[in-house]
């Protein structure tokens, strides 16, 4: 299957550069995956499309302020360090710019020495393993010194970094937000509970690979990045009960979808307490074992994310919906509008 099949024309002006003032003011396109029929709404009315007994599944990961600006202690030369993955203790896999300035043994300093680091290993493509040294709690130091690693297509500064976090974010570890969840407010979550809609949480720490373009010519040749996930026993039990009682499982975002499908595919369509690394790549032809629908944002042309959405709703339905979204000037990507596939 050719990657070109997932291309579409997107005017640059429709790429949302800043979040809306109110989270739930985003528009909501509702797509019927069987018929391709479209309904236009707003996110604050998402409750109207969910039934008592359904379950939405949210990713409670929290984005790290993972971009650090510092200097080499020896020369004062400026360096930028992007945290990718915690290895062991205070050792992290990072991306360093300019990489040539940082060799094994190089000592770096951030925030007037409040945080220092030594390079322990050189990796390919500008990657470096770095061991941090600090006083106190690492994540508190990082909160005070780090900046949010916004996606490459967002050029504006983010005034309020909490707007790149979901209201239910808890577990530190992501390099990017699970953006479908950015539309939810505490009021919407309360209203869903009041209606009898179950709310379940999983964790998947989003890696920067989520922004990596599909460079292969054929979809099947794409090498999917791996991300860490976990599901609690409580969530697994709830999802199994919802399934047994005939409710729908609606994942919020591609990250929740990939977590649920990873676990269900390994346990014959059922859910269990689990954690590990997933590199599941979902594209048309995939048979879903976990979800009945999903809430997601509007994705980049030819991305692995639009392929996942097409696997659920059908490529032609999705591309037709995206053309309609462009015509109606929906906002695209991380700070953009939402789609409910049901």
From Swiss-Prot:
GO (cellular component) term, any one: cytoplasm
Major localization class: cytoplasm
UniProt pathway annotation: tRNA modification; tRNA-queuosine biosynthesis
Keyword annotations from UniProtKB, A to Z: Cytoplasm, Queuosine biosynthesis, S-adenosyl-L-methionine, Transferase
HAMAP family documented for this protein: QueA
Subunit structure: Monomer.
Family: Belongs to the QueA family.
Protein name: S-adenosylmethionine:tRNA ribosyltransferase-isomerase
